[in-house]
Structure formats: C-alpha cells, structure tokens
Amino acid sequence: MGLPWYRVHTVVLNDPGRFISVHLMHTALVSGWAGSMALYELAIFDPSDVALNPMWPQGMFVLPFMTRLGVTKSWGAWSVTGESFSDPGIWSYEGVAVAHIILSGLLFLAAIWHWVYWDLDLFRDPASGELKLDLPRVFGVHLFLSGALCLAFGVFHVTGVFGPGIWVSDPYGLSGKIEPVIPSWGAEGFDPYNVGAIASHHIAAGLLGLIAGGFHVLVRPSQRLFVLLRMGNIETVLSSSIAAVFWSAFVVSGTMWYGSASTPIELFGPTRYQWDKGYFQEEIERRVQASLSDGCSLSEAWGAISPKLAFYDYIGNNPAKGGLFRSGPMNNGDGIATAWLGHAVFIDKEGNSLFVRRMPTFFETFPVILLDQNGVVRADIPFRRAESKYSIEQVGVTVRFFGGSFDTLSFNDPATVKRYARHAQLGEIFDFNRSILQSDGVFRSSPRGWFTFGHLSFALIFFFGHIWHGARTLFKYLLAGIDPHLEEEIEFGTFEKLGDDTTKKELV
C-alpha cells in the first residue's frame, strides 16, 4: 500500500477479524513483557535484607505490583516479608511470571487464528449479509465483562473469600503483609490511605459496570444521538478508548506520586512529601520521647528504633531527588545500605544539644547549619573561613551517636564532626557499600518516580490522541465534504466518496 508509519492501522479499518487479531497480538506482547520482565527482576533481585535493601532501592518495577496483589514467596526459598515457609505453591513469583508467558503464547496463537480466519459470519448482518458491527452493543458487552471482573476482584480476591487478599501495612511501612480486607462502606471509604476502600470501590464500580453494560446491550440509542455522537464510526471507539486510558494514567500517576493505600511505601518507596513534612522524623521523635517518658536512657530509646523506619528518613530515598536522566536503581547512586550508624547528636562547648538543618528536596547543595532547641544558629561549616564565627572548631562541637551500630560512640575531631554533620543534613546516617555495584554517589529516583513520570508522559500524549481522533470523528463530514445524512453504513459507520450519488440518503 505504501502507507506511512502513522497510517498503518488503516489496513484493519474495515476488517473486524484482523482488528481483533492485532489487539490479541498487542495483549500477547504486554503479557510476554510482564512475564519476561518479572523473570529478569527475579534474576537480579537480592532478598537478603528486607529492611535496608528492599525491592524499591534495587529498582524493581514489576515485583512490587505482583507483591501488592498477594504474591510474596519465591521458588528460590525466600519471601519478601522474610517469613519462613515450606511450599510456595504454584502462585509464586516465578509461577506468575511463567503463567504470563504461557498466556502470551496462547494469545499469539489466537492472534494468528483470527488473522487467517478473518471473515467470520459474526461480523455480517444476517439479513443483508453485509459487513456490520453493532458498536453500542459491543461497548455494552465490554463494559459488562469489565464490570464483572472488577466486581469479582473486589468481592473475592481483595476480601480473601477466594484469594489471598492484598498488601496491608501500618502508616509507617513497618508491618506490611498480605491479608484479607474488609470493605469500608462509610465516609472512611473515601480515605485514599484506607485499604478497605480498595475492596468497596471495586465492588461498587463493578456493580455499576454490570448495570451500565446491561443498559447498553439492551437499550438502543436514538437515531439522532447515534448520528450526533458518531456511534457507528470505529474512530469514535478509538477516541473514547484513548480517553479512558489517559484518564486512568493521570489518576494512577496521582495515587503513585502522592501516595495511597494501593502504593505502599514498603514496595514502592516513600513519597517526596514524607520528606518535606518530616513525616518519619516526627514519628521517630515521638517514639523516642515515649521511651524516655517510660524511664529509658537516650541510648535505649534510640536503640528501640527500627533501622527500617530510620531508612525511610533519609533524603536519598526521596523519589524527587533523582534526575530524569540518571538511569538505574537507587542503589547505583548511594550503594547498598548495610547498617544504620545511629542518631547523631551534636553538642557545643556550652553543653547545648544541636541538630543539623535538613536539606530541602530541590537543593543539590545546602549550607550545613547547626541549631539549638530554640532554632538559634550555634554552629556551621562556613564557606569562607576568614569570616567565620560559628565554625565547628570555634564553637567546639562534638558528636555522639545513640542507637544503631555507633551507639554511645562520640567524636571530637573537627574533621570527623564535619563529616557526620554533612551526613546528618541528609537525614539519618547509614553506611553504604558502593563497591559492589560501583555506585557513583549521585541520587537516583525510585520506581515510584519512574512510574509517575512514565504514566504522566503517556497520559499527555494520549490526551492529544483523544483530541485528534475525536475531532477527526466529529468533523469528518465537514472536513471531507461528506453528507452526514446517510442511510447505508460503510466502514463500520458513515463513509461516502466525494461525488458519489448512489448511496441512499435519508434526512434525520
């Protein structure tokens, strides 16, 4: 045909059999990619430390989605939660990956079958024998089936009636596990961080889909509405489908970037707003103060803090710190976290306890300033030594650690104090192994950041695609000089060659 690359879909325009075939092939490619990508991630994933080296710093993209739906065990005898087990069963990580690859092969065969046997009686009007698809009814069938799937997921899988449940955790991402969920039908069901809303919303949306699908199957649109919305044109279907896809992409970009019950921090990493608000810092401080109120020492209070919680309170795990052109997982930047050194407390020669002001998200460099409990600057690392008044040496600052591997250790050497002051600017202090992955020390983004960027980009492209195809559909007659009042339907809808006076016409 000599078609340009952006017109190649023209070959399936009047061919519903091969139209189905290319969609089957596309689904086969998606399913095959998912299974293959899962196997690749499993080959490089290190499950040895679920606290300091979980899946998100390792750049896992497919595994978190499998995990949140109930897959936690591997045929390699490890579990993402660290629990022990004897038999992972069929639906392990590898089992799900292989199932997707098998499904891909079956879809590939189905695509070939529909490409060969393209001219089915199903696509022809029994009365006239002409090619005809009832697109409003096809829409109803698709809506009904998707509603049934959505309802079944909410009723059976999420609630644990016939399925494992979904990933449930506490607000600070410490106790995550798979468990059944009870639907939330009250006002709390609109809380984006309430897992019960996932069950109730899938049930409600599924029921709505069943009702709407049944309506579109049984009720016929008026002729005026049919013509007005171009319901007989396959490009209307394309435009509407793109609208559904780009809207979904915008929604999931929001739930991923801002955080929600469906994007747990244990699987996708923390959000940037948790760093901006000092979310984990406040919780750690609250726990320490509670321990001190119970009579514990500073060492005991900080020693009770989980390294997993402390690891969230580190700026390198902020997805907004990684640039879009810094490829690779977070571990390629910082390295692999091996230990929490402990909480650093700085003390000047007057006995004031000082803390380092933390770096905001969108700064690459930031002055190292040490403040007392009243927010008064007591020490800093000056840019110009000649003009310094609050340097570490002048103020006589020492550092002492509580909790972690440096518990009760103290340092008074100015160079060492400066080193840990710079580290404290980035949150809790950790020891990283950079040699294993030859990490370069430059921050990377987490899968949360990449998912958001990718889906926002495609949503924007698909938005313009929706406008383009919608405009082509609505204004086709105006642009092509085609009479909109036609009785015969060709090309799934209305089509007439310019100057054709043989097609029957009827005024609406």
Curated annotation (Swiss-Prot):
Pfam families listed in its UniProt record: PSII
UniProt-recorded Gene Ontology molecular function terms: chlorophyll binding; electron transporter, transferring electrons within the cyclic electron transport pathway of photosynthesis activity
Gene3D superfamilies: Photosystem II CP47 reaction center protein (3.10.680.10)
TM region(s), chain numbering: 21-36, 101-115, 140-156, 203-218, 237-252, 457-472
Source domain of life: Eukaryota
Locations listed in the record: Plastid, Chloroplast thylakoid membrane
InterPro entries the record matches: PS_antenna-like (IPR000932), PS_II_antenna-like_sf (IPR036001), PSII_PsbB (IPR017486)
Textual note on the cofactor: Binds multiple chlorophylls. PSII binds additional chlorophylls, carotenoids and specific lipids.
An example Gene Ontology biological process: photosynthetic electron transport in photosystem II
Location (main, coarse): plastid
Any one of the GO CC terms: photosystem II
Membrane topology of this protein: Multi-pass membrane protein
Keywords: Chlorophyll, Chloroplast, Chromophore, Membrane, Photosynthesis, Photosystem II, Plastid, Thylakoid, Transmembrane, Transmembrane helix
Homology family: Belongs to the PsbB/PsbC family. PsbB subfamily.
Quaternary structure note: PSII is composed of 1 copy each of membrane proteins PsbA, PsbB, PsbC, PsbD, PsbE, PsbF, PsbH, PsbI, PsbJ, PsbK, PsbL, PsbM, PsbT, PsbY, PsbZ, Psb30/Ycf12, at least 3 peripheral proteins of the oxygen-evolving complex and a large number of cofactors. It forms dimeric complexes.
NCBIfam families associated with the record: PS_II_CP47
Reported function: One of the components of the core complex of photosystem II (PSII). It binds chlorophyll and helps catalyze the primary light-induced photochemical processes of PSII. PSII is a light-driven water:plastoquinone oxidoreductase, using light energy to abstract electrons from H(2)O, generating O(2) and a proton gradient subsequently used for ATP formation.
Protein name per its UniProtKB record: Photosystem II CP47 reaction center protein
Organism per entry: Euglena gracilis
Designated gene of the protein: psbB
